[in-house]
């Protein structure tokens, strides 16, 4: 985790530059997020305007609130990237996209891609699943359906909820959003109810 410039590895410093682009949320005109029509598994660029303190506080109520908000998801993903453990949220996102597929002919190739990337023995971003869930998901690959990853996705969600989500709420990635003054928001008149994420990347900048 990035705690200060002096103790950071070079890889963290490099990844921080990417975070600044990915976390370009919070311009100055709106409290809403612009939802992109497509998602790239690699660092999706999220363009959020400003996030109200009320919304930020909701993120602490549940992981579901956090990752179903465009800006919350971006902040959580950046936090996981700083810990080199973003494979879980990437898998969750891939499962969400998979369930939106309308064409039956596209299910099988997409399912195999997700399986090979996150679940197979040689997966490039293998997620931590128990043997029973892994075997069940492997059997589902014989005839992929829209629900073939449901159990695996649920297990990974529960894992994030118990572990990384709790650490996120104690991290600067979240705490700086709950304290706008630490980001210089007090200098902006009329911005008392909104959070600025500049300091989200300050630990690595």
From Swiss-Prot:
Cited CDD domains: RGS_RGS4
GO terms of biological process kind: G protein-coupled receptor signaling pathway; negative regulation of signal transduction
Lipid-binding residues (covalent, S-palmitoyl cysteine): 2, 12, 95
Summary of the tissues where the protein is detected: Expressed at high levels in brain, moderately low levels in heart, and very low levels in lung, liver, and skeletal muscle.
Protein origin, superkingdom: Eukaryota
Record's comment on post-translational modification: Either Cys-2 or Cys-12 or both are palmitoylated. Phosphorylated by cyclic GMP-dependent protein kinase.
GO molecular function: GTPase activator activity
Name listed for the protein in its UniProt record: Regulator of G-protein signaling 4
Primary gene name: Rgs4
